[in-house]
């Protein structure tokens, strides 16, 4: 699809402004009195030389103040009475003044309103990582994508040097996105590591629930937005992992720069990472597990089912509290609640009811039909039950099958902080 190019010449124009001829000695006083009524325009001064007098300056008023009774002293019905009185008292002449404008004098909003047809949304929100701005333009804006990119580069700089647009879905194993360059330098270091800056408040919210004695496992740690602050600020012991070697590289750098000294970093598949921790001698008794890969996190819960709901493999450590991020489609909630549906999706993976004190939190709208959710729960476990019947009881029991119950496992007995249930804590 071809894209229209930006023509900056259409913004070259002359506008007529109300000007006040003011003695230089009165400039400071007038500027204070007329605050809120002066010209505000990018790269245009509101005080200019008066071509008719070296002793005076021309003070330019807001574009909303129309020309009125030019040549008179202090007559303009759009000014409040006190300012009109000021003009009369000091015999200040009202004149017309022509101001030449070009593309540089217009704001981002003004340029976009001129370029984008009425009825189409003006793009305001975009992610920024370093010098790179990246957008996710809607289909109806694609014919204007290059113009939009150039305007962002011109009006949101100089810190922005590259503007990208996401193309297609995020479907790579490392959760990076396909993109196209809209404007600026082809300097794309951020293409190999992606951090979603919109979630910085969510990172803080979760980390604040941790205590210094917690042992935290971050299965999809990325560059460390959870792991590094948990180590540096809360002083937790953190085991952080990511499959993407580039993410691991920059996570190590972030940990070093921030003096986060309690992090152990791995570059493994998430399931293998957890298995390795619990297979150590002694096993790592982690208390918190973070799973921040919303598109597939929920599928990786099976590793906790494998470890804590399998009595043959269960390590001698308490079950952790799990914080799992997931996308919940709104369309699937017909006849149900977003939070209830999230709980059902998790229970389908671990094949066990969740505790009653499970909490589900809506993090943000991803799209009109999708929500990002965080579900936090204590991982259920199974408890071995030993029969304590004495020999006399066994002899009096005519059912011989009871003799085989010693040291067997009751698969129906769940041990968890809140018992079985689906109650949601809001």
From Swiss-Prot:
<keyword id="KW-0949">S-adenosyl-L-methionine</keyword>
<feature type="binding site">
    <location>
        <position position="203"/>
    </location>
    <ligand>
        <name>S-adenosyl-L-methionine</name>
    </ligand>
</feature>
<dbReference type="GO" id="GO:0005759">
    <property type="term" value="C:mitochondrial matrix"/>
</dbReference>
<keyword id="KW-0819">tRNA processing</keyword>
<keyword id="KW-0539">Nucleus</keyword>
<dbReference type="Pfam" id="PF02475">
    <property type="entry name" value="TRM5-TYW2_MTfase"/>
</dbReference>
<protein>
    <recommendedName>
        <fullName>tRNA (guanine(37)-N(1))-methyltransferase</fullName>
        <ecNumber>2.1.1.228</ecNumber>
    </recommendedName>
</protein>
<dbReference type="InterPro" id="IPR025792">
    <property type="entry name" value="tRNA_Gua_MeTrfase_euk"/>
</dbReference>
<dbReference type="GO" id="GO:0070901">
    <property type="term" value="P:mitochondrial tRNA methylation"/>
</dbReference>
<dbReference type="GO" id="GO:0002939">
    <property type="term" value="P:tRNA N1-guanine methylation"/>
</dbReference>
<feature type="binding site">
    <location>
        <begin position="242"/>
        <end position="243"/>
    </location>
    <ligand>
        <name>S-adenosyl-L-methionine</name>
    </ligand>
</feature>
<dbReference type="GO" id="GO:0005634">
    <property type="term" value="C:nucleus"/>
</dbReference>
<feature type="region of interest" description="Disordered">
    <location>
        <begin position="374"/>
        <end position="426"/>
    </location>
</feature>
<feature type="compositionally biased region" description="Low complexity">
    <location>
        <begin position="396"/>
        <end position="407"/>
    </location>
</feature>
<keyword id="KW-0489">Methyltransferase</keyword>
<feature type="binding site">
    <location>
        <begin position="269"/>
        <end position="270"/>
    </location>
    <ligand>
        <name>S-adenosyl-L-methionine</name>
    </ligand>
</feature>
<feature type="binding site">
    <location>
        <position position="292"/>
    </location>
    <ligand>
        <name>S-adenosyl-L-methionine</name>
    </ligand>
</feature>
<comment type="subunit">
    <text>Monomer.</text>
</comment>
<keyword id="KW-0496">Mitochondrion</keyword>
<dbReference type="GO" id="GO:0052906">
    <property type="term" value="F:tRNA (guanine(37)-N1)-methyltransferase activity"/>
</dbReference>
<dbReference type="Pfam" id="PF25133">
    <property type="entry name" value="TYW2_N_2"/>
</dbReference>
<comment type="similarity">
    <text>Belongs to the class I-like SAM-binding methyltransferase superfamily. TRM5/TYW2 family.</text>
</comment>
<dbReference type="InterPro" id="IPR030382">
    <property type="entry name" value="MeTrfase_TRM5/TYW2"/>
</dbReference>
<dbReference type="InterPro" id="IPR056743">
    <property type="entry name" value="TRM5-TYW2-like_MTfase"/>
</dbReference>
<dbReference type="InterPro" id="IPR056744">
    <property type="entry name" value="TRM5/TYW2-like_N"/>
</dbReference>
<comment type="function">
    <text>Specifically methylates the N1 position of guanosine-37 in various cytoplasmic and mitochondrial tRNAs. Methylation is not dependent on the nature of the nucleoside 5' of the target nucleoside. This is the first step in the biosynthesis of wybutosine (yW), a modified base adjacent to the anticodon of tRNAs and required for accurate decoding.</text>
</comment>
<keyword id="KW-0808">Transferase</keyword>
<keyword id="KW-0963">Cytoplasm</keyword>
<dbReference type="InterPro" id="IPR029063">
    <property type="entry name" value="SAM-dependent_MTases_sf"/>
</dbReference>
């Amino acid at each position: 699809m071809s894209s229209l190019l930006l023509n900056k010449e259409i913004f070259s124009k002359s506008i007529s402004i109300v000007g006040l001829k003011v003695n230089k000695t009165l400039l400071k006083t007038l500027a204070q009195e007329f605050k809120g009524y002066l010209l505000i325009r990018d790269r245009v001064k509101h005080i200019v030389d008066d071509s008719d007098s070296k002793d005076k300056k021309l003070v330019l008023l807001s574009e909303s103040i129309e020309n009125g009774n030019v040549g008179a002293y202090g007559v303009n019905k759009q000014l409040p009475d006190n300012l009109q009185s000021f003009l009369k008292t000091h015999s200040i002449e009202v004149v017309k003044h022509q101001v030449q404008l070009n593309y540089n004098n217009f704001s981002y909003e003004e340029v976009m309103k001129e370029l984008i047809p009425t009825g189409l949304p003006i793009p305001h929100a975009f992610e920024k990582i370093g010098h790179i701005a990246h957008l996710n333009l809607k289909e109806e804006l694609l014919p204007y994508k290059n113009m939009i990119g150039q305007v962002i580069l011109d009006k949101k700089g100089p810190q922005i040097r590259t503007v990208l647009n996401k193309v297609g879905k995020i479907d790579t194993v490392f959760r990076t996105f396909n993109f196209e360059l809209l404007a600026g330098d082809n300097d794309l270091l951020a293409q190999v590591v992606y951090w979603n800056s919109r979630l910085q408040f969510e990172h803080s919210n979760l980390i604040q629930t941790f205590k210094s004695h917690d042992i935290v496992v971050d299965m999809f740690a990325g560059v460390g937005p959870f792991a590094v602050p948990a180590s540096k600020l809360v002083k937790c012991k953190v085991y952080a992992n990511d499959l993407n070697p580039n993410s691991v590289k920059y996570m190590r750098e972030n940990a070093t720069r921030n003096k986060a000294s309690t992090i152990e970093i791995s570059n493994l598949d998430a399931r293998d990472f957890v298995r390795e921790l619990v297979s150590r001698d002694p096993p790592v008794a982690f208390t918190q597990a973070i799973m921040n890969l919303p598109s597939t996190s929920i599928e990786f819960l099976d590793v906790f089912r494998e470890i804590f709901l399998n009595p043959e493999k269960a390590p001698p450590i308490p079950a952790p509290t799990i914080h799992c991020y997931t996308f919940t489609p709104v369309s699937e909630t017909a006849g149900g609640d977003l939070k209830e549906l999230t709980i059902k999706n998790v229970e389908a993976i671990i094949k066990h009811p969740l505790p009653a004190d499970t909490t589900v939190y809506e993090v943000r709208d991803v799209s009109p039909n999708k929500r990002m959710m965080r579900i936090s729960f204590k991982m259920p476990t199974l408890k071995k039950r030993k029969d304590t019947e004495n020999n006399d009881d066994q002899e009096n029991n005519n059912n011989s099958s009871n003799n085989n119950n010693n040291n067997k496992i009751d698969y129906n007995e769940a041990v968890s902080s809140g018992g079985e249930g689906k109650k949601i804590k809001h």
